[in-house]
Amino acid sequence: MKIQQQAFGGSEKMLKGGLHCHTTRSDGDGDPADVIRLHYQNGYDFLALTDHRYYNYTNFAPEVPMTIIPGMEFDNTFARNKGFRCFHTVCIGPAREDGNGYEQDERMDSGKAKDQEEYQSYLDAIHAKKNLTIYCHPQWSSTPASYFNKLQGNFAMELWNSGCAIEYEMDNNAAYWDELLGQGVKIYGVATDDGHGMHHHCKGWVRVRAENNIASILNALENGAFYASCGPEIYDFYVEDGKAVLECSPVAKVRLHSDMHPSHMRRDPEGNITHVEFNIGEGEKCGYAYVRMTVIDSEGRQAWTNPIWLD
């Protein structure tokens, strides 16, 4: 039996989109219109302007045919006395007429939760307004997985955050992802920019198999019909006859990740890998609960599939 990851095999175009960025509406350097134009010039089809606690539906560059995904970023800081930790959440939702509970320019106060059990009430309120949520930059937030592994309702978490990687060399969020996946938490992974400076933008994105409208994009995201990338393209990912198979643009490394050994890795110093097959066993001979792949091109840029669950 062939199990194909949801991003592949459909007839829709693979749209390029940004899910986390900031403008002068909060603490970003770029005017909203300039940020939208920059993304359009870099081949983006859709973009969420997720300024801190300040909801947005508006395309501030109306001459640009960019689908604007409604959204904002919600934040919560705790343990302030001797340093602090954070919960940050990107919220993205439908058009106002499709039931989104937020108003244009609606402002929110920062959260005051002291732990994930208290923070859940904020997520519940966001979900009640028909918004999807992404757990942001756990490494930068100094939140080990045990601080957020019980949060309910996040459809995704950030694997890559360009601002954190550029400014702090913090790009190891995928390790947290595998910890959650290994615990049975079914959550997808996204690459974002969290762009504050203009030089942060257009470095991490998602490729979503959807029609180019808000409802279709959100449905595809919620159902895992996408992959995350900083450059490489992924064309197919599936499991069949005891093998995990991936097709991609030319890369130098491909790694299979799961909750168990053995791990699998293929390398080509020339950077010409476009097809890999890893034997993972079939039926009772397969000990993995899930498999996912990371590809790395000759410039060090990564892309990540979402998991295929096998249990």
Residue ranges, per PLM feature:
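Short, well-ordered alpha-helical segments in soluble proteins
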Residues: 158-164, 181-184, 225
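Short, hydrophobic/aliphatic alpha-helical segments
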Residues: 173-186
